[in-house]
Amino acid sequence: MIEKRRSRIHGSGVYATQPIPKNKRIIHYAGEKISNRESLKRELRYIRKGHIWCFKLTNRTVIDAGVGGNVARFINHSCRPNCYIDIKNSVIWIRAARTIRTGEELTYDYNTDGDGLIKCRCRPGCQRLI
């Protein structure tokens, strides 16, 4: 249903290999469960390399896709995403916000609480910092 390839947005991306219907669960965001405190240390290392791989699950728990992650960590940010996040039973699911065409890159809004250290490249002219 999906595959990792080069992306125009940022490095690698995830693409649909077949049409994906609206609201379909596509993949879960996998990684090591760590404390919020530990994630602050790791995020600094990742951000220096231009990556955002820590996903806040709760106020105390973060999923670090840099350790034990799957291809979901390569789904890029977009200010106009075609996917959304759905957290069920402590599992972070990426779901289709609309029907996604074959060959289309999957994106979701990272909606970060960060310091705006990474320039958004979701489309030409986007000036947002994530």
At which residue positions do the language-model features occur?
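Conserved catalytic SET/PR domain of SAM-dependent protein methyltransferases, capturing the structural core
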Residues: 1-130
